[in-house]
Amino acid sequence: MPDDARLIEQARSGDSAAVDELLARHQQQVLRFGRQMCGNEEDAREVLQETLLAAFRKLGHFRGESLLSTWLYQIARSFCARSRRRAVGEPAQTEPLEQPEAASVPSDAEPPDDTAHAREMGIMLHDAILALPEGYRDVIVLRDIEGLSAENAARALGVEVGALKSRLHRARAELRARLAGAAE
């Protein structure tokens, strides 16, 4: 965001309206990231709350070496990992009847068969991404879904750009294989 730097400075000087605006600007992208990484709305909303609270508390530690969104993704990623660790050993979660947020829902102008097919494809893609190992899921979500540059995604993951590109290549290959297996 163009004037995040101005808002960060205002927030650091105690302007609560600047803090509110700054966090509100990034709320949707953090929630979307949480949905993709956690796989369900409830955990994603919890990750969003924890991320925004942590960002509020630690805004003074943000050095500005990367975009604020990159810093927020790093925070959210750690909370997603905690959420997944808590879920280990718990019974499988039931999926709500509503479609996952990641599913693409075309406009009403499309024929019902096309709409159903697109929804089915969206669900398959969502499930295939969730089935990827964490390191692959992280890179797919940051680069291909959130659209971060290779540099910002590498910063968010704490890896070199070359390592990120290599991991992205392997992640895309595994995702293609999973989707091809699901289509059979």
Language model features: what each stretch is:
Residues 1-4, 90-115, 149:
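Internal acidic/polar
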Residues 10, 92-98, 103, 118-119, ...:
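C-terminal edge and immediately downstream basic/flexible tail or linker adjoining helix-turn-helix-like DNA-binding
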Residues 12-21, 31-50, 161, 183-184:
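Short, charged helix-capping/linker segments at alpha-helix termini
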Residues 12-13, 39, 50-67, 85-88:
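Sigma70-family region 2
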Residues 45, 127-163:
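Helix-turn-helix DNA-binding module
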Residues 46-53, 66-78:
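Structural recognition of an alpha-helix C-terminal capping motif at a helix-to-coil junction
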Residues 60-64, 74-95, 110, 118:
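Arg/Lys-rich amphipathic alpha helix in sigma70-family domain 2
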Residues 77, 81, 145, 150-151, ...:
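DNA-recognition helix of helix-turn-helix
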